[in-house]
């Protein structure tokens, strides 16, 4: 399933996969790659074509991330970046990503060039980062402007 969708074949470690099973058939798969530099990357997300648009991917991601307390990165096509915001993923510059994630990003960009010559659809890739809930809350609190106190109303003369 992962190979059939032409996803990044590096870092596939089958024990790390979560699969969605329906009536004994695997209809989806996703993993968190654990890189040698300590970074972790959500990847190899795939759902069988006849089960797409039914929430299979969302349920797998919900389950996979529910107990995560460490930062996680992912590489996705630009049109899909906003979809992952619901799980706390935010777009970052490639230079801000860990070395191994940047390496996978570069592999993906090279694959795009091959796609161009094979006349396959090309999509721009982006890197997303998901911080732990505690750190996300702190960052959002710092970004939020201070509340403005309402002025006391005085009766008109």
What is each PLM-predicted segment?
Residues 66-79:
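Conserved GNAT acetyl-CoA-binding A-motif
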Residues 14-16:
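Short loop/turn microsegments at loop-to-beta-strand junctions
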Residues 1-11:
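Helix-loop element at the rim of GNAT/NAT acetyltransferase active sites that forms part
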Residues 3, 52, 85:
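Short polybasic/polar patches that bind polyanions
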Residues 78-157:
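Terminal substrate-recognition subdomain of acyl/acetyltransferases
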Residues 19, 25-34, 39-46:
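Conserved beta-strand in the GNAT
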Residues 29-30, 59, 70:
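Intrinsically disordered, low-complexity linear regions
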Residues 47, 53-66:
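Conserved acetyl-CoA-binding loop-helix of GNAT-fold acetyltransferases
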């Amino acid at each position: 399933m992962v190979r059939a969708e032409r996803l990044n074949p590096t870092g596939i470690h089958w024990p790390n996969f979560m699969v969605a099973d329906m009536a004994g058939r695997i209809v989806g798969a996703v993993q968190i790659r654990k890189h040698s530099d300590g970074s972790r990357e959500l990847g190899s997300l795939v759902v069988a074509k006849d089960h797409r648009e039914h929430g299979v991917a969302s349920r797998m991601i919900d389950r996979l991330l529910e107990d995560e307390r460490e930062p996680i990165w992912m590489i996705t096509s630009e049109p899909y970046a906003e979809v992952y915001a619901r799980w706390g993923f935010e777009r970052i510059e490639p230079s801000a990503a860990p070395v191994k994630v940047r390496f996978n990003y570069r592999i993906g960009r090279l694959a795009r060039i091959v796609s161009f010559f094979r006349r396959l659809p090309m999509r721009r890739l982006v890197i997303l980062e998901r911080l732990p809930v505690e750190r996300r809350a702190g960052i959002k609190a710092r970004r939020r402007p201070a509340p403005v106190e309402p002025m006391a109303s005085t009766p008109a003369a």
